[in-house]
């Protein structure tokens, strides 16, 4: 796909109010067809931060180091209003708060998610060596790999994934390592940026870390993305790093990769929810 934008999108921007986003059918979530997918909420938070709080003149200097998205209410398939404000703007740190509201029948505007973004000013690493866990050595698929055709079962997927373990014959627990490539714009007519893409991939920490022999039976209440650099290229790799659960509460973490190596992590907390 060589065009500047994808044919399909998760949101249409309101014609009269640039803070209002109208979801398309592609944005529905896996738990309830009347609610939005978590990945589009985290993507929208990143879109807001980048659109209003990372000026073009400062993009080379500011690193989005953390994006936390608390999803404390189901997001209905209705118009979303996104607002943001600067909480702190210092010489080396900038903190942004994002609020996402939805129009709920008989209740009006209701806040359904809140996000906090921490932007840090880039400089140089201090001298010395620090221990880091070993990285995977799995090359991403080709940037020119064709997207699934209309007849392919993946053609209706809201992302394109390739598993490096697809040829392994031994039985494995589901969804441990994947390469993921976006197939939709977040906002119609706007090719998603690298930050928007990785904010959406970050939501994959839930199925990536919390799926097991019976599939996915945890629904995440948040996404917490950490980045020490921006991702490079179309493909982003997810590697399950941690899962722990007790009494129906779980924490799961994935490590994030691109063609140059590891660039961050994503962690979710989740509630047990059998399907």
Regions found by a protein language model. Name each.
Residues 1-275:
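Terminal targeting signals and extreme-terminal segments of soluble enzymes
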